[in-house]
Design a protein with these regions (language model features):
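Substrate-recognition/cap regions that form aromatic- and gly/pro-loop-enriched pockets
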Residues: 111-113, 118-173
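Loop-rich catalytic cores of soluble enzymes, especially ATP-dependent carboxylate-amine ligases
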Residues: 1-109
Length: 173
């Protein structure tokens, strides 16, 4: 967090914390990218999702372009100058996934074979549970995910996406 504004408090000589914060990892000081701030990736349809991800990978981000791909010694210091360097850099609270062989791109796997599972990224460990999450909480999460998968719902609008993002920020911070 050096050089970035934050409202964390010192815990000791080397650590910071925020009382009541639920997930620093998913907050604005965690796995976030200002380059992704204006992406409008929704989960209405796999093809639409993949088109948006591909666009984010192939659309240059000025700050990344200015860095260049290699440093002064010719060593790579970034993969590309795209808004997303690779698919796995999409920092969202949930991501469709499919495991594949080493070297296969997540985009290609999802396009060719579809979704195998969802990566739910907004869940942190429960410090009160030795395993990090209880069996009951996993089962509840399973039920919620199954319900969402089988219940028909309307497509996510731009306004709804914006509200979800605002709610995420409010809940995390």
């Amino acid at each position: 967090v050096d050089g970035r504004g934050n409202d964390l408090e010192p815990l000791n000589d080397s650590d910071l914390f925020k009382k009541g914060a639920t997930s620093l990892r998913m907050s604005e000081i965690g796995y976030q990218s200002k380059a992704q701030k204006n992406l409008n990736i929704k989960y209405n349809d796999l093809d639409e999702f993949l088109d948006e991800v591909k666009s984010a990978i192939t659309t240059p981000y000025p700050e990344f372009e200015n860095l260049g791909l290699k440093d002064s010694e010719g060593e790579f210091h970034q993969i590309s100058s795209g808004i997303l360097q690779i698919e796995n850099e999409l920092y969202d609270c949930i991501r469709p996934k499919r495991a594949g062989s080493s070297g296969e791109r997540p985009y290609d796997l999802l396009k060719k074979e579809g979704i195998k599972y969802l990566e739910v990224r907004g869940i942190d460990l429960d410090p009160e549970d030795l395993a990090g999450i209880s069996k009951d909480k996993i089962l509840l999460l399973d039920l919620i995910m199954l319900y969402c998968a089988i219940k028909p719902s309307s497509l996510m609008s731009d306004k709804e996406k914006s509200i979800i993002e605002s709610n995420d920020i409010a809940a995390i911070n």
